[in-house]
Amino acid sequence: MQAWIQQGLHGMQMGGRVGNYDQTFVVYGPVFLPNATQSKISEINYGGKILLPSSALNLLMQYNIPMPMLFKLTNMAVQRVTHCGVLEFSAPEGQAILPLWMMQQLGLDDGDTIRIESATLPKATFAKLKPMSLEFLNITNPKAVLEVELRKYACLTKNDRIPTSYAGQTLEFLVVDLKPANSVCIIECDVNLDFDPPEGYVEQPRQVTPAVTAKPPAPDASAFIGAGQKAGGSGGTGQNATSVFGGAGRRLDGKKKPSSSVSLSDGTGVSTSNAAPVANDLPAIPPVVVNEDYKPGRVSFLRYDYKRVDVLEKELREKEASKAGQPSNVFRGGNRTLRGAR
C-alpha cells in the first residue's frame, strides 16, 4: 500500500489528470471483512472511516485527490447523504466496508449499492453535540473524552448519530449544529465544542425564597427597662427595688419628724410612691425565630428596630412625667431653716 501511495504522489508531482472520483460499490458491514478480528471490527464501528478496495487507491492518485481524502456517500434509493474518510484500502474488490452506524444512517443493508464521491470540506470551527442517553452525565470531563474519540473521525455531517466507546459502554451523540457548513472536516483544526442537554434530561425547578425587605418589630421596651433595673439594683442583696435613702428621719433640734410622708425617687426620676412594684418574673425577650425554610445560596441579615437602653429609659421618664402633670422631685414638702426668723 505504501508503494501505491508513493506511486500516486509521484504521479501528482509529474502532473496527473484532475477530476472528481465517483464510483459505485456494494456495501457490507465490518463482520464481512475477511480475517477480521474483534478489535478491527470495533475500530471500524466506533469511527467515521470506511474501507475501500486497492483499485480505488490507483484511481484516487490518478485524479490527484488532495489529502486528507474525504468522501460523500449517497444512498441513491432514499437520497440519504453523509461524509467520511478512508481507513484502509484492504476491502474486497467491488466492495466497501462501512461502520454499522453509517449504514443505519443511510438506510443500507448488507449487499445494497452505494455511491462514493470525492469531496472537499471546510475546516470545522464549531460543533454542538447532543448526548442520546443520561449516561453522559457520569463522564467527569466529556470534552477531554471526545477530544480522543473524535480522532477516529475524519469529518462530521449535521443530523448524524455518531457512536463513541467509554468505560466499556457505547455513547451516541447527535450532531446538532456545525460551522461553517453542515458538513465539515475535523482533521488538524481547533473546534469549539458545545453540548445540548442529554436526551430525557429534565431540569429540576429552582425554589427561590423571597428576600425580606421590611424590618420585624422590636420586642416591648418594658422587657429591657425591667431587666436593667433588676441587673443594676439587685447588687447581690436579693432586693427587686432600691430606695435613695433608707431608715427613719432625724431632726437637729430634737423635735420629732413630721408625720407627712416623704416620697423618694428610685433614681430614675419616677416617684416610688406611685411607681408600680417590679415583678419577680420579668417579661422574657421573644425567642429568635429560625427560618427553617432557608435554602443555601442566600444569606439574610435581619436588622431589628432597637433603641438603646438609655434612650428607652429617657422616653419612659418623660412619659410618666407627662402623665403626672408636673416634673418629679426627689424631695417634696415645705422647706425648713436652722436659724430662727429675724
Curated annotation (Swiss-Prot):
One of its GO terms (molecular function) is polyubiquitin modification-dependent protein binding. It holds the Pfam family UFD1_N1. Residues 245-276, 318-342 are annotated as: Disordered. GO terms for biological process: embryo development ending in birth or egg hatching; ERAD pathway; positive regulation of protein localization to nucleus; ubiquitin-dependent protein catabolic process. Residues 259-275 have a biased composition (Polar residues). Its main location: cytoplasm. It is found in: Cytoplasm; Nucleus. Keywords: Cytoplasm, Nucleus, Ubl conjugation pathway. Disruption phenotype: RNAi-mediated knockdown causes embryonic lethality. In embryos, DNA replication is partially impaired causing a delay in S phase progression in P0, AB and P1 cells; simultaneous RNAi-mediated knockdown of DNA replication checkpoint kinases chk-1 or atl-1 suppresses the delay in S phase. Prevents DNA replication licensing factor cdt-1 down-regulation and causes cdt-1 accumulation on mitotic chromosomes. Functions at a post-ubiquitination step in the ubiquitin fusion degradation (UFD) pathway. In association with npl-4.1 and/or npl-4.2 and ATPase cdc-48.1 and/or cdc-48.2, involved in the cytoplasmic elimination of misfolded proteins exported from the ER. This pathway, known as ERAD, prevents the activation of the unfolded protein response (UPR) caused by the accumulation of misfolded proteins in the ER. Belongs to the UFD1 family. Forms a complex composed of ubxn-3, ufd-1, npl-4.1 and cdc-48.1; within the complex interacts with cdc-48.1. Interacts with cdc-48.2. Interacts with npl-4.1 and/or npl-4.2. PANTHER family: UBIQUITIN FUSION DEGRADATON PROTEIN 1 (PTHR12555), UBIQUITIN RECOGNITION FACTOR IN ER-ASSOCIATED DEGRADATION PROTEIN 1 (PTHR12555:SF13). This is Ubiquitin fusion degradation protein 1 homolog. The lineage of its organism: Eukaryota, Metazoa, Ecdysozoa, Nematoda, Chromadorea.
